[in-house]
Amino acid sequence: TITIVFMPIGESTKKMKDLKAGDAFMDFVGPLGQPSEFCSEDIEELKKKRIVFVAGGVGTAPVYPQLKWLHEHGITADAIVGAKTKDLVILEKEMSAVSNLYITTDDGSYVRKGMGTDVLRDLVQNQGKQYDVCVAIGPMIMMKFVCLLTKELNIPTVVSMNPIMVDGTGMCGACRLMVGNEVKFACVDGPE
């Protein structure tokens, strides 16, 4: 059994929202790309790292299994989840079981009003938290502002480029980007 987390925006996802457990898809591809970089790190070294995740909207879905994996290996990370409204906060119970969870909503309808970057800035500048790495997954604009903040705070940051994937094979080139001086494809080499 798999769980698919999506937001009904386009024609396909609007049709998907009407499917019930047990209904079938014609085709399904995934997972795409490579596992999280954490999976290849030495666990004892990873336990020394202070890690923060910033998730926006449905970007919370790929953050959860990473947090769960870390938790299963004795590592507790901080997680900041941002959503437009209370109704769009997902996986709260699951996330709080495997991380130190902070929630913010754009409209202030749940927990704290503001953006994930507001919480991250507060944790570092007002609460004295220090992080060795930040992982940001969510809308491109959210990841941009997380990167601007983490650059200012001198926190190395990993982003997920899954929003730009199209065909998942690297053939179309839509998810091509430069990492350093090397061409990478989010769907094959990423998404992080």
Predicted regions and their residues:
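Short, surface-exposed secondary-structure boundary micro-motifs
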Residues: 30-31, 180
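A generic structural signal for residues embedded in beta-strands
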Residues: 27-28, 177
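Ferredoxin-reductase
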Residues: 1-23
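Structural motif
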Residues: 50-52, 78, 133
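Extended interfacial segments that mediate partner engagement and assembly in macromolecular machines
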Residues: 25, 32, 50-52, 57, ...
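Short glycine/serine/threonine-rich phosphate/pyrophosphate-binding segments
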Residues: 60-66, 142-145
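Reductase modules of NAD(P)H-dependent flavoproteins
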Residues: 80, 84-192
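Short, Lys/Arg- and Gly-enriched loop/turn segments at beta-strand edges
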Residues: 32-43, 187
